[in-house]
């Protein structure tokens, strides 16, 4: 069939070229539609279930909210694991599904299970699923702030919207904001009701998260003394507000043949109307809200805050829908924010702080630069070694054509163009088959012209092209098949490594398949069309000189093979020993151009105190000349996609381009050290320096933010915490450990209110009445809403902040007694019904698959991940004795490394088996198959030496490089063996066949090795964004091809000579024995 394809491609060459052009146009269109991202999205399929329970402790949340939800989810088909976190007033259950699951269907299933679980949950608890987004979802951050944060520098015009001469801020609706809370509440209102609704309509945006400021509320602050004097309870106050603030419909009336809709609208529209609401009557005199309480515009008791460059702001985050194009979505969000900025109230601005498209563009620029430079190097080698620009052009055209055809397949397989899928393309590797056919066609045409002594006729030329293509079709087909086969097992990668490398492998296989088809169709057709004139009879000087130098060594290797074979064995032995000195890591860290400084304080730190710590930290870091801006997110945002306690902050450090860094500062590590120096004097913080995407990936995949985590499982939280502290002490002594920390699970100060049930009964009250009074005064009680157009704001009854924190005021809080006939309503102070106690409680309870756990996390610097964990595990086993029933597991990036290493132990042998099977099909001789397979270990040896020389650890990226170089080495060996066998078929003696076959294949072997290795050179030496991820793969391929080429040209002929001589000695009719 293949020979028919070759003949047809030459016969109908113009049709083939026309169809190729059509496919190229379609490919160009598909390439333009290709989604672009930084890296493949390695986040597992998961759903986050968030529940807000403001009045519960962590243990209560675990028992009454988290556990029932976990129980409801258990047994759901497709669930792989669960993990949960219970904090003060908040629960999050993360459900992780199998990769084969349909996320939208699973969300529906989770929703049904939650509906079944609601009867088992406390009243008013409404579990909510997080947005349909991933670890790469936060594509755009922006800050909503005042153009002049404190009014300094603003143009002041009293009475007009903006800053006023008295220091207040006048809104466009006439509200005067004269305190910090109201001004921050106004910024949050702009974010929630102007920016967010418009931004959510942007294509590809799943949702928009808001953090910082205060959600605006109309706060009713009771005067407890006046309430007691008037005999008004908190329940009376709430009921009055609810009864006053309503709207009803009363159908319609007919009048003069027309229908009139009847409306009874008594909704409250302002704070003044709240103050005038009547609560009750005393001696026929109405008592209003304003007589017993102060009404003001305030904010919620917030759980999160944000700031930028030392000033409090509101930060918004655009979350990308799963599967969307991050570059397109981020650019669309930026464009939309520019439009929204024109509609903002005077004095308020939007400041973009993090734009993912900038990182995407920088990364793709690196990839494109490497691909273009690699392609140019490949073309240059083709021109130099072929000595015919037409032939070189034919081979070079396969490069863009294979890329365009691959783009069609990438879209069909939903693979984005990113650092891994496009960055690993080596056009030299891809066009090896085309190069072999072009080189052989060029050689045969030159020989035929020389024999005929004239230019060939059309029929002669076409006949020669078909014959030359047929001659090389066997090594080409099987050679390409070998390269294809070595990548096939990589598709069995699972988990994170599967998500990271499967797109790369599929893209490579698409490119190889495209180039293979083109080499059988387009290349013969182009050779027939373009190589019409006289073809040079001599080879280029470089090849001639190389052959002259090579022949004596080749003859020596065939005559005396053992020294050459011994050198090959020694090389492999040395490489095996050297590999033990190569470090290990899961993946090289992508330089995201920015940094993230995670700050954790003692558990009792309030959200306001966290902000007070963040503001000077931002100013200190901002003083570094290489830093462009610093913004912080403390606590939990509205969607709780990344929930943190009030004592934790994420400080995003946006760096300037490296060209603007000060002299002497050239690396990220230096910047991190300078940041540590700035933050060192700030006591009370525990820092962890990572990068934004890296941090989110680590957290979403493994539940931790750092490189390494030691997870300690057990039941007793006190024992878990104590064991974790001992493990942390060991980790801190382990070389390479940085940012070691243990989340503080206990030590959260608790103010307990203990009910005196006997006293409550004596006063004729119930526990619920007392509890409701406490809850309303402390936490606040919603009492309706005020509508302002589309906006709606809660009316909340709550004590003023200073009174909520004053024990004397709380003790005197009046609890209204039941009404007695004929008597004024009396009250009793709260202190006579309860007792106050200060204790310490739990800060957080974390669980994995229903098992409680505490983790110790650390980053690794100055050494590779694998050796660090080996060292730390040995120290922990020696120095830390685990209590009965307790065990530990390693998590974070090391967990991914472990899983990938186990998978590689299966993949690598499978690759060798597939290579051997393919070779045997091509050669038909077990001995010669084994001979060609010796190319693999020497190719691997070169990769090991290259890693060691460059100080690059072994990673999954390097492993893929080892697999790739094995295929190229085998391809070159197959090309050489095919030439040797051809001469044996012609009746040559074994030694002569080996020598002449090897001499004939010097040029194709050198060409395939050079184009494959030089295509990777730009990746190996690149310094742009994302280059660090490509370097291990490129380094291994280049180093491996150096040793593999030496093997092919020296050791392989030496081995082949021995094998052929023995076969000849065993069978006089050697020729027949060596046939396929």
From Swiss-Prot:
Q: What is this protein called?
A: Nickel and cobalt resistance protein CnrA
A single GO CC term for this protein reads: plasma membrane
Would you identify the family this protein belongs to, as annotated? Belongs to the resistance-nodulation-cell division (RND) (TC 2.A.6) family.
* Pfam families found in the cross-reference section: ACR_tran
The record's function comment reads: The products of the genes cnrA, cnrB, and cnrC are likely to form a membrane-bound protein complex catalyzing an energy-dependent efflux of Ni(2+) and Co(2+). The mechanism of action of the CnrCBA complex may be that of a proton/cation antiporter.
Q: Which organism is it from?
A: Cupriavidus metallidurans (strain ATCC 43123 / DSM 2839 / NBRC 102507 / CH34)
Q: Which Gene3D superfamilies match?
A: Multidrug efflux transporter AcrB pore domain, Multidrug efflux transporter AcrB pore domain like, Multidrug efflux transporter AcrB TolC docking domain, DN and DC subdomains, Multidrug efflux transporter AcrB transmembrane domain
- How is this protein situated with respect to the membrane? Multi-pass membrane protein
């Amino acid at each position: 069939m293949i020979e028919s394809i070759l003949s047809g491609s030459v016969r109908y060459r113009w049709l083939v070229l026309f169809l190729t052009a059509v496919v190229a146009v379609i490919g160009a269109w598909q390439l333009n539609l290709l989604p672009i991202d930084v890296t493949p999205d390695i986040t597992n399929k998961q759903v986050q279930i968030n529940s807000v329970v403001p009045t519960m402790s962590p243990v209560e949340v675990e028992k009454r909210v988290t556990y029932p939800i976990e129980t409801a989810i258990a047994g759901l088909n497709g669930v792989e694991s669960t993990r949960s976190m219970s904090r003060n007033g908040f629960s999050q259950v993360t459900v992780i599904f199998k990769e084969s699951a349909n996320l939208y269907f699973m969300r529906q299933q989770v929703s049904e299970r939650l509906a079944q679980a609601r009867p088992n949950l406390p009243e008013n608890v409404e579990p909510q699923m997080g947005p349909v987004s991933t670890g790469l979802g936060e594509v755009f951050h922006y800050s909503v702030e005042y153009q002049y944060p404190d009014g300094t520098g603003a143009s002041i015009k009293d009475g007009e919207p903006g800053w006023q001469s008295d220091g207040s801020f006048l809104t466009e609706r006439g509200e005067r904001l004269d305190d910090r809370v109201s001004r921050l509440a106004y910024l949050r209102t702009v974010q929630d009701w102007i920016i967010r609704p418009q931004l959510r309509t942007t294509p590809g945006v799943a949702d928009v998260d808001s953090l910082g400021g205060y959600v605006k509320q109309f706060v009713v602050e009771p005067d407890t003394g006046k309430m007691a004097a008037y005999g008004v309870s908190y329940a009376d106050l709430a009921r009055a507000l609810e009864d006053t603030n309503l709207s009803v419909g009363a159908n319609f009336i007919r009048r003069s043949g027309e229908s009139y809709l009847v409306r009874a609208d008594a909704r409250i529209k302002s704070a003044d109307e709240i103050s005038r609401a009547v609560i009750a009557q005393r001696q026929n005199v109405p008592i209003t809200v304003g007589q017993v309480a102060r009404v003001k515009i305030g904010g919620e008791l917030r759980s999160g805050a944000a700031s930028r460059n030392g000033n409090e702001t509101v930060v918004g985050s655009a979350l990308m829908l799963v599967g969307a194009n991050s570059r397109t979505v981020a650019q669309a969000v930026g464009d939309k924010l520019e439009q929204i900025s024109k509609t903002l109230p005077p004095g308020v601005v939007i400041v973009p702080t993090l734009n993912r498209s900038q990182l995407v563009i920088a990364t793709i620029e690196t990839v494109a630069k490497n691909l273009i430079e690699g392609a140019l190097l490949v073309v240059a080698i083709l021109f130099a070694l072929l000595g015919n620009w037409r032939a070189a052009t034919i081979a070079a055209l396969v490069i863009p054509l294979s890329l365009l055809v691959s783009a069609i397949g990438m879209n069909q397989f939903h693979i984005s163009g990113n650092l891994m899928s496009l960055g690993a393309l080596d056009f030299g590797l891809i066009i090896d088959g085309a190069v072999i056919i072009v080189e052989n066609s060029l050689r045969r045409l030159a020989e035929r012209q020389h024999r005929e002594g004239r230019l060939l006729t059309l029929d002669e030329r076409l006949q020669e092209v078909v014959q030359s293509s047929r001659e090389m079709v066997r090594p080409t087909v099987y050679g390409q098949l070998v390269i294809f086969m070595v990548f096939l097992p990589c598709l069995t990668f699972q988990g994170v490594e599967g998500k990271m490398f499967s797109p790369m492998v599929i893209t490579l296989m698409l490119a190889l398949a495209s180039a293979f088809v083109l080499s059988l169709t387009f290349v013969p057709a182009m050779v027939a069309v373009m190589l019409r004139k006289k073809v040079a009879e001599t080879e280029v000087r470089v090849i001639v000189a190389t052959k002259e130098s090579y022949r004596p060594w080749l003859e020596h290797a065939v005559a005396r093979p053992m020294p050459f074979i011994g050198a090959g064995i020694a090389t492999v032995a040395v490489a095996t020993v050297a590999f033990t000195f190569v470090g290990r890591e899961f993946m090289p860290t992508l330089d995201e151009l920015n940094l993230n400084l995670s700050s954790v304080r003692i558990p009792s730190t309030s959200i306001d105190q966290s902000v007070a710590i963040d503001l000077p930290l931002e100013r200190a870091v901002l003083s570094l000349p290489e830093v462009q801006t610093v913004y912080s997110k403390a606590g939990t945002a509205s969607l709780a996609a990344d929930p943190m306690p009030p004592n934790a902050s994420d400080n995003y450090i946006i760096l300037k381009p490296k060209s603007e860094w000060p002299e002497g500062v050239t690396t990220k590590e230096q910047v991190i050290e300078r940041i540590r120096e700035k933050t060192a004097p700030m006591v009370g913080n525990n820092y962890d320096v990572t990068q934004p995407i890296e941090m989110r990936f680590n957290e979403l995949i493994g539940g931790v933010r750092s490189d390494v985590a030691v997870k300690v499982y057990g039941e007793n939280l006190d024992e878990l915490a104590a064991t974790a502290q001992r493990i942390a002490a060991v980790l801190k002594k382990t070389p390479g450990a940085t940012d070691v920390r243990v989340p503080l699970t206990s030590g959260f100060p608790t103010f307990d209110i203990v009910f005196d049930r006997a006293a409550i009964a004596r006063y004729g009250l119930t526990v619920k009445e007392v509890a409701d009074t406490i809850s309303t005064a402390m936490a606040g009680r919603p009492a309706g809403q005020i509508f302002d157009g589309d906006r709606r704001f809660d009316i909340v009854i709550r004590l003023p902040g200073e009174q909520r924190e004053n024990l004397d005021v709380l003790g005197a809080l009046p609890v209204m007694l039941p009404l007695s006939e004929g008597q004024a309503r009396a009250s009793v102070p709260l202190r006579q019904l309860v007792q106050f106690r200060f204790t310490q409680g739990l800060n957080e309870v974390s669980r994995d698959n229903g098992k409680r756990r505490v983790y110790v996390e650390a980053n690794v610097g100055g050494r590779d991940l694998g050796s660090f964990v080996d060292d730390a595990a040995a120290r922990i086993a020696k120095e830390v004795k685990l209590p009965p029933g307790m065990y530990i597991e390693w998590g974070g990036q090391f967990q991914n490394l472990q899983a990938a290493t186990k998978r590689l132990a299966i993949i690598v042998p499978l690759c060798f088996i597939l290579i051997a099977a393919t070779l045997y099909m091509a050669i038909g001789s077990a001995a010669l198959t084994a001979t060609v397979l010796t190319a693999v270990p020497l190719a691997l040896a070169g990769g090991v030496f290259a890693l060691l020389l460059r100080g690059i650890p072994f990673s999954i990226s390097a492993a893929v490089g080892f697999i790739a170089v094995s295929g190229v080495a085998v391809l070159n060996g197959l090309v050489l063996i095919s030439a040797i066998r051809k001469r044996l078929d012609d009746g040559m003696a074994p030694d002569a066949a080996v020598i002449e076959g090897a001499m004939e294949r010097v040029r194709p072997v050198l060409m395939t090795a050079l184009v494959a290795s030089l295509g990777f050179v730009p990746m190996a030496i690149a310094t742009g964004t994302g280059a660090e991820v490509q370097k291990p793969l490129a380094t291994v391929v280049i180093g491996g091809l150096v040793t593999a080429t030496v093997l092919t040209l020296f050791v392989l002929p030496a081995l082949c000579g021995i094998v052929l001589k023995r076969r000849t000695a065993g069978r006089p009719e050697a020729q027949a024995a060596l046939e396929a």
